[in-house]
Amino acid sequence: MLKMANLRLEFWDKDVEDKFIALKVEAYYDIIKELLFAHLYKNGYNCTNHLCLIAYLKEKIKDFDFEIQKVDELRKVRNEISYRGLTIKKDYFERNELEFKNIIQRLKEEANSIQ
């Protein structure tokens, strides 16, 4: 899971045309989701849905409340993109990209700290 998350991050860590912003937002959610699953599996847990991942985050990662809200918001945005064809404005992405990257970094650190 960590390898796939890193591969996705490497692929999407570049500027894209505005018409691809929704795909990049989806990709950030997928990267975060894969890192969460890696964390889950390393702790011996399994999860069957995205809400379970959010609940796991709340329980297991301390001092992460704002980030958890941002991940849940991203989950909802990703669902709107995937299931309703929502288009994403560039300013949404620009306002949130740094936070997405910070969440990814923290999740990588958390996953790597598990023995």
Question: Which residues does each PLM region occupy?
Answer:
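Terminal alpha-helical segments
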Residues: M1-Q115
